[in-house]
């Protein structure tokens, strides 16, 4: 399952939409909720990002992300 993680690079200031960045993770999980939990744990263990949202990408959404060139799988 591919998850899109929306985050701010710092926890020191208030989140601003204009500064939101994304990363994509491939998580092996039984359910969507388990995948979100694993994604959050993985990111928080590696980097001190302020995570705003984690969403599971549907097949169509993933294809769109690949077509726009925004998709790049992140590995820790």
UniProtKB/Swiss-Prot annotation:
GO terms for biological process: DNA-templated transcription. RNAP is composed of a core of 2 alpha, a beta and a beta' subunit. The core is associated with a delta subunit, and at least one of epsilon or omega. When a sigma factor is associated with the core the holoenzyme is formed, which can initiate transcription. NCBIfam families: PRK13667.1. Keywords: DNA-directed RNA polymerase, Nucleotidyltransferase, Transcription, Transferase. Disulfide bonds: none annotated. Its EC number is 2.7.7.6. It catalyses: RNA(n) + a ribonucleoside 5'-triphosphate = RNA(n+1) + diphosphate. The gene is rpoY. It comes from Streptococcus mutans serotype c (strain ATCC 700610 / UA159). Belongs to the RNA polymerase subunit epsilon family. InterPro entries: RpoY. A non-essential component of RNA polymerase (RNAP). This is DNA-directed RNA polymerase subunit epsilon. Signal peptide: none annotated. One of its GO terms (molecular function) is DNA-directed RNA polymerase activity. GO terms for cellular component: DNA-directed RNA polymerase complex.
């Amino acid at each position: 399952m591919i998850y899109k993680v929306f985050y701010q690079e710092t926890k020191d200031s208030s989140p601003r939409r204009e500064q939101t960045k994304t990363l994509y993770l491939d998580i092996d999980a039984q359910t969507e909720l388990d995948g979100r939990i694993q994604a959050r744990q993985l990111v928080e263990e590696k980097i001190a990002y302020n995570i705003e949202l984690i969403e599971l990408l549907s097949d169509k959404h993933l294809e769109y992300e690949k077509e726009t060139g925004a998709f790049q799988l992140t590995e820790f």
